[in-house]
Amino acid sequence: MKAEPARASFMRRQAVAFELGITRHTLARVLKNDPTFPRFFAITPGIEVIERLDFERWLQRKRLAARLNQHG
């Protein structure tokens, strides 16, 4: 049986904000102030997304950095 290629999973701003437990307004500030945050891109006029995998990698890096800072 032939394996299917992996399909990208995308997230809109509202879903990202929900995952982080913040408002979309706060997410806008994160985008403005954190150059490491994945950038949204338009898939159609008016619909911007980021790749879920990029978001999850960013979140893992943030969690790791927080743990390292916590332990000095």
Regions found by a protein language model. Give the residues of each.
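A short, Lys/Arg-enriched interface patch at domain edges and termini
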Residues: 52-72
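Polyanion-binding surface elements
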Residues: 1-29, 61
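Major-groove DNA-recognition helix of helix-turn-helix-type DNA-binding domains
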Residues: 20-49, 56, 65
